[in-house]
């Protein structure tokens, strides 16, 4: 994968987020195979498949209840990362060792799903979310975390370096 691909995938998360009907924030997520440079699945935040378009039916329940962004993550729509992971399960696509691109920091609930699913790296645009609990959780659970800026090539270059976890696996005597 090259820097131009990283820029493209990150920009595509922003485009994908435009499909969300959430009135508060719009997130898009892609899960990409770094070996083939192909998108496996995607997701954006919104109501459940076949259900209401918003978490409160025709209104945003988080707005109705005055819930501050970054808190009470169990209330509201399905997040982009969760939708992408669920889509992979629904379609029978393994995402273990793959890279997840999202246009904002994952919340703690999405971080738990990401770590459990076996995602190797999370590449995200900084500033999309008001909490860093999810980032701390991912780091604690050995998921590579890469905040990037489309204007900062050094942040993009760091994504292409092997992580400790990957280096350790590559040097395994059991291969």
Model-predicted segments: where are they?
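Zinc-dependent deaminase catalytic domain
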Residues: 1-175
């Amino acid at each position: 994968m090259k820097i131009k691909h990283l820029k493209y995938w990150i920009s595509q998360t922003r485009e994908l987020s435009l499909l969300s009907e959430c009135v508060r924030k719009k997130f898009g997520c892609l899960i990409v195979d770094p070996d083939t440079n192909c998108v496996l699945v995607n997701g954006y935040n919104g109501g459940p498949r076949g259900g209401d378009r918003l978490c409160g039916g025709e209104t945003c329940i988080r707005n109705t209840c005055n819930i501050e962004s970054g808190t009470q993550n169990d209330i509201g729509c399905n997040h982009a990362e969760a939708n992408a992971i669920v889509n992979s399960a629904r379609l029978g696509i393994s995402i273990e060792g793959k890279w997840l691109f999202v246009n904002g920091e994952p919340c703690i609930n999405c971080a738990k799903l990401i770590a459990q699913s076996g995602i190797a790296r999370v590449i995200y645009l900084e500033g999309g979310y008001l909490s860093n609990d999810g980032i701390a959780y991912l780091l604690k659970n050995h998921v590579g975390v890469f905040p990037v800026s489309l204007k900062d090539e050094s942040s993009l270059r760091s994504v292409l370096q092997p992580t400790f976890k990957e280096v350790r696996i590559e040097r395994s005597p059991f291969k």
